[in-house]
Amino acid sequence: MKLWKRAAAAIKDRKSLLAVGFSRRNSSYRNADLEAAIIKATSHDDSSVDYSNAHRVYKWIRSSPLNLKTLVYAISSRVNHTRSWIVALKSLMLLHGVLCCKVPSVVGEFRRLPFDLSDFSDGHSCLSKTWGFNVFVRTYFAFLHHYSSFLSDQIHRLRGNNRRSLEKTSDSVIQELERIQKLQSLLDMILQIRPVADNMKKTLILEAMDCLVIESINIYGRICGAVMKVLPLAGKSEAATVLKIVNKTTSQGEDLIVYFEFCKGFGVSNAREIPQFVRIPEEEVEAIEKMIDTVQEKPKLEKDEEKEDEKAMVVLEQPKKLQTIITDKWEIFEDDYRCFDRKDKWEIFEDEYHQNHLPLITMNQPVYITYTMPDLITF
């Protein structure tokens, strides 16, 4: 960024901070300190990320869900009035961190992002220089838009399930399969977020890719964990869907390796080492395929049995009733296939990656507001 552009960008940020300072009124949706932290965390500077103010925003959000109104108001105003890809991308990264706060009262309210960047276009440079950044912002927005909706739906679904005393196992399996398919769609979206132009090797892009690499590991881990849990519970009616999900998971594992290799070549720090991804055993896949074949063969067997049953049917006439005696024939299907010890492998793999804190998204730190109580007892 040229010197005069940096100066103009700094002036814009300063004006925004002054505007917040002049309107220092704390109402139900205004918090001047939080708004100032949001402006600083989404500044026009593409050479660095203000980690301290980003984490300050997260602390405000986790300390009280009431601050969500201020966040929505401030960040939507910020994004709707900007034509800078830098501000737009930093705003997306900031909201990504908010979604990772894991505060149900906050995440549950984010059914959609408070702004629309689906057709974003930078207005400060010519299109030949900014088209790659525009694509990056749009694809990142598309992922977060669906991710926020997914997380919100999960929160509300869990609340609904907790209100029910009993739930059918078949219904829970179907819900879990639908959840896995949504996670797979989200992972596909992440794999589309990457630099596509030659002039995009900038600090801010590298920071965003660091976040996305860790998020891809997180989502893929949730997919694998959910698949391993649902395999022993799935019946013959869900076998075809399960096989489709398993094949998709295997394919995404290969795509994720390619994504890591690209990120490593681009210089993303969290992709310096390509992990050994957990694969679903061939025995599991063969068991599902066998179950599907059994279901497909069953109609033929039933037709043959009907013909044999007609021959084996004996009608005994009695004075006031007819009694039908049918030969007993039972077919046993083995649904409960054993799964290998999957939990330990994945937890070790996931823990190794989560030891590297996300550059802008560090959520697993408890936040407390400490108040010093006056000593009113000492004489």
Curated annotation (Swiss-Prot):
The keyword Membrane applies. One of its GO terms (molecular function) is 1-phosphatidylinositol binding. SUPFAM superfamilies: ENTH/VHS domain, GAT-like domain. The lineage of its organism: Eukaryota, Viridiplantae, Streptophyta, Embryophyta, Tracheophyta. Keywords: Coated pit, Cytoplasmic vesicle, Endocytosis, Golgi apparatus, Membrane. This is Putative clathrin assembly protein At1g68110. It is found in: Membrane, Clathrin-coated pit; Golgi apparatus; Cytoplasmic vesicle, Clathrin-coated vesicle. Coiled coil: none annotated. Residues 26-158 form the ENTH domain. GO terms for cellular component: clathrin-coated pit; clathrin-coated vesicle; Golgi apparatus.
